[in-house]
């Protein structure tokens, strides 16, 4: 797989939908792509595969849902399993990044942009993926 311009894809893992965002390390920018729905109780791997093949990311970032005290919850284990599946299916680096409060921030961003019409679950999920990706990129740049 050829990597284009240090592109990144982030996933906001959920048990019904998975928010997806794309970003570029070179410009430190990101944008929402879509929300991938589950099919018969499992992630839509066909759609996820198409996204990965289309964008050819260098890295995949998956949100790590933690309790406010940093402890694990049920969704933490599921998100880690999802990240492992991505690693095994696509043979590329998959990093996890703390996603605490991203849904609240995503709702705030969308409400400011679109009012109540912006508060649709799929929009929230993909905007959460943007926030996860932005936070990951900022953490990388500030470590330098």
Curated annotation (Swiss-Prot):
InterPro entries registered for this protein in UniProt: RNaseH-like_sf (IPR012337), YqgF (IPR005227), YqgF/RNaseH-like_dom (IPR006641), YqgF/RNaseH-like_dom_sf (IPR037027)
Cell compartment(s), UniProt: Cytoplasm
GO BP term, example: rRNA 5'-end processing
Enzyme class (EC, first level): hydrolase
Classification via Gene3D superfamilies: YqgF/RNase H-like domain
Domain of life: Bacteria
Record GO cellular component, one term: cytosol
UniProt keyword terms in alphabetical order: Cytoplasm, Hydrolase, Nuclease, Ribosome biogenesis
EC number: 3.1.-.-
Gene Ontology molecular function terms on file: nuclease activity
The protein's role, per its UniProt record: Could be a nuclease involved in processing of the 5'-end of pre-16S rRNA.
Family per similarity comment: Belongs to the YqgF nuclease family.
Protein name according to UniProt: Putative pre-16S rRNA nuclease
Taxonomic path: Bacteria, Pseudomonadati, Pseudomonadota, Gammaproteobacteria, Enterobacterales
Gene responsible for this protein: yqgF
